[in-house]
Amino acid sequence: MAQSKMPRRPAMLDAARADAIVGDEDPAATAAVAHTAAWALMGVGDETFTDADVARLRETVRTSGVDTIAHVWSRSPEFTLPGALWRVYLLHEWYHRDPLLVAERYADGSRAPIIQGLEAPVELRPLSLIMEEVDSLLRGDLTDDDLEYVLGEASRAMRVLAAGEAGALWIEDPADPLAHRVTMRHSALLVTADELDVAAREAAVGTLD
């Protein structure tokens, strides 16, 4: 792995406040908690969120699942780490809920003559391998050094999914548990792929907030 980059982000809250603030309506506080959880999942703490706090959060995620913290990312902008992780989380949840559907759409897209955003010839990896890497990221098994690669691979997968006959639509039913402004917007898969590409580039140079 490359030498770890020092991320640029808002000041983290202390561990007790991060645990207690779920559901807080204060946007600044919610954003701070989202950043705390996201960077801690990557193994990054600071003077107020110690290595022990980080280890405890990662262990909680590994034993109880990323759902325990993911919801605090749902309002985060796409150009931030929590925003990028939220988008990857939505892909993760979709894949694990509907594995056959997602696999079929990926296979369909892989046969498309043109995959928007990918230059021909396109060498595609099995979707299962990409999702294993996404799972590792969301379990806290990876670090911020892995962000560029995993976010980029998630973006490529979304471009392939959008290339088939079903197009770039993602979630259409507003009653779907995965219905969100990210998943229900026009050309949702492609727009999200673009956002993840930007986040990957920012991660590569250590400027992902």
Task: Indicate residue ranges for each PLM-predicted region.
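A contiguous, surface-oriented mixed alpha/beta subdomain in the mid-to-C-terminal portion of proteins
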Residues: 71, 87, 96-209
